């Protein structure tokens, strides 16, 4: 589970390209719809805790259960991790790497408008092996972080709240040019997946 600084920096590069409108190809297809949203990312610092052998973690400040058992969405353990490890959430994006017991790839605890900026609730949890070069293929390209940071910045799923009137500005992800979807899509993209008819 140990993540190198070079993999962290590679993840920051993926985030910067994704939110900067990079139109490079992905699996041979050019992303001509990419938009520069004006967000840039820089690696600031990382606190490394030896979790290469989770059963033998000896860092007293970090309970060994935090890497697996406690690292789950909405749990007391999640709150304990954030409260203990967060660095000034009003100035930094805190990213917590762990191995969630429920198989989650990542999550955010809250959208940006739900708590004051200084609240430790703000931050992103990621399965450590989803970073570029990790073992979670095909989810090891850094795109899970892009997805979760999108939520951190206030973007909803296109299926958020189900399928409503196509012309309802609050439907789906509340972005007018993406149609709301009735359900989540896992796997291959399905164009217009369960969209509401106009």
Question: What are the roles of these predicted feature ranges?
Answer:
Residues 1-89:
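Propeptide-to-catalytic entry region of secreted or membrane-anchored zinc metalloproteases
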Residues 136-198:
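The catalytic-center signature of Zn2+-dependent metalloproteases
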Residues 38-40, 90, 120-121, 198:
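Sequence-level motif detector for i,i+2 pairs with an aromatic at +2
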Residues 7, 71, 111, 115, ...:
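Solvent-exposed, flexible loop/coil residues
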Residues 15, 43-45, 95, 126, ...:
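Generic structural hydrophobic/aromatic packing signal, biased to beta-strands
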Residues 73-160:
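Active-site-proximal segment of zinc-dependent metalloprotease catalytic domains
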Residues 24-35, 77-85, 107-116, 184-195:
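Intrinsically disordered, low-complexity boundary segments flanking structured domains
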Residues 17-23, 48-50, 100-103, 130-132, ...:
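Acidic glycine-/aspartate-rich tracts in secreted/extracellular proteins
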């Amino acid at each position: 589970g140990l993540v190198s600084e070079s993999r962290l920096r590679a993840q920051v590069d993926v985030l910067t390209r994704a939110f900067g409108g990079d139109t490079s190809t992905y699996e041979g297809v050019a992303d001509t719809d990419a938009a520069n949203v004006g967000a840039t990312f820089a690696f600031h610092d990382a606190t490394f805790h030896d979790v290469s052998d989770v059963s033998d973690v000896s860092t007293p400040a970090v309970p060994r259960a935090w890497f697996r058992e406690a690292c789950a969405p909405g749990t007391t353990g999640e709150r304990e991790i954030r409260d203990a490890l967060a660095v000034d959430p009003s100035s930094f994006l805190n990213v917590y790497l762990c191995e969630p017991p429920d198989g989650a790839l990542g999550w955010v605890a809250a959208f940006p408008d739900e708590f004051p900026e200084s609240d430790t609730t703000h931050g992103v949890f990621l399965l450590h092996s989803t970073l570029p070069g990790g073992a979670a293929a095909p989810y090891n390209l850094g795109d899970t972080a892009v997805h979760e940071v999108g939520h951190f910045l206030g973007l909803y799923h296109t299926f958020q709240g189900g399928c409503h009137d196509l012309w309802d500005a609050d439907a789906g992800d509340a972005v007018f040019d993406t149609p709301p979807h009735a359900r989540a899509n896992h796997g291959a993209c399905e164009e217009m997946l369960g969209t509401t008819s106009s």
